[in-house]
């Protein structure tokens, strides 16, 4: 019998979330971002659930090949662009569009003499990660347009702080829009998830929706439910053992948690090797038998322990939700100093 743990993906939730983001996009073309194996939800599931998206955006040609094999016939965009001259031929074979963010990529395209490559010029409007400075971007676009077989589609940028709670960040959406200048009024794909949800002033003819498609709010101060989003992944497991622990006894590595009363401790078949963070502190909620039980002790590689003293129904075989509909992944992420997307 397999170990009792699974990540269940709700395709209807994915479809619902796409509909929410589609309505927020207000008629603009929508790229569904499926990088990192569709944020851990599976590229095959993404192809099925995001059939109504205008295109899929990912990181490399391996992903593009997978989604083509899964039956995706619409547009595909490489968000980080191509990495080597050898990528140009499969770009064309797979009919994949690519971001261009650096002069070396222009040189590769010029030397490759492509027959049909569609490019999106990345603009560094203040995030300082990828892209040409706003003053350099039109020059890059002109150089690309001069290469036979290359078609420039639009300008693309990415906001560093598009969350609703980031209005006082060192670099704001307004700062980056100002840096874009007239480029923001040309053919452009500007809005990421946060900008789609919280910044209607960001225009452009296309948007890129990421984590919200999977039911995760981009702002930990705003719940997914408040945005109309439904968590699409449920990480579930089962209780595999129970321990009666006396006051003064401790649980787990490092003896981090000590019982203050006679306690009933449940051992759950999930650990950090399964993606549940080892850094999760005591007290983090786990859903079992219709109630929340607190984490009690350090997370092990393939087990964790929870205090079910106040949940008498909890027993060996009881189903446990680590995150999903009842336990918000953003809440867990905040407790261990990361973001929901990482989990």
Where are the predicted features?
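C-terminal accessory subdomain/extension
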Residues: 244-343
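Residue-level signal for inorganic ion chemistry
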Residues: 14, 67, 155, 239, ...
């Amino acid at each position: 019998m397999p170990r009792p743990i699974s990540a269940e993906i709700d395709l209807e939730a994915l479809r619902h979330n796409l509909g929410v983001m589609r309505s927020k996009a207000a008629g603009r073309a929508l790229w569904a971002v499926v990088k990192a194996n569709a944020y851990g939800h599976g590229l095959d599931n993404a192809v099925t659930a995001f059939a109504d998206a205008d295109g899929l955006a990912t990181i490399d040609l391996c992903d593009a090949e997978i989604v083509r094999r899964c039956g995706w016939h619409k547009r595909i965009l490489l968000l980080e662009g191509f990495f080597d001259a050898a990528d140009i031929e499969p770009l064309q074979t797979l009919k994949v569009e690519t971001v261009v963010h650096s002069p070396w990529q222009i040189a590769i395209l010029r030397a490759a003499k492509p027959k049909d490559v569609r490019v999106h010029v990345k603009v560094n409007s203040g995030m300082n990660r990828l892209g040409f400075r706003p003053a350099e971007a039109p020059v890059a676009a002109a150089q690309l347009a001069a290469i036979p077989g290359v078609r420039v589609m639009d300008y693309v940028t990415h906001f560093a702080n598009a969350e609703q709670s980031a209005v006082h960040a060192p670099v704001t959406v307004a700062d980056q829009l100002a840096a874009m200048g007239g480029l923001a009024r040309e053919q452009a794909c500007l809005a990421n998830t946060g900008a789609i949800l919280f910044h209607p002033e960001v225009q452009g003819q296309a948007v890129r929706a990421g984590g919200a498609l999977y039911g995760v709010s981009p702002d930990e101060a705003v719940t997914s439910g408040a945005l109309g989003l439904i968590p699409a992944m449920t990480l579930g497991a089962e209780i595999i053992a129970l321990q009666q622990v006396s006051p003064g006894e401790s649980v787990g590595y490092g003896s981090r948690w000590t019982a203050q009363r006679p306690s009933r401790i449940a051992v759950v078949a999930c650990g950090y090797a399964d993606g549940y963070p080892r850094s999760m502190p005591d007290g983090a909620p786990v859903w079992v038998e219709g109630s929340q039980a607190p984490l009690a002790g350090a997370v092990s590689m393939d087990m964790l322990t929870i205090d079910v003293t106040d949940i008498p129904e909890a027993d060996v075989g009881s189903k446990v939700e680590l995150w999903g509909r009842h336990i918000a992944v953003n809440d867990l992420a905040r407790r261990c100093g990361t973001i929901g997307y990482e989990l």
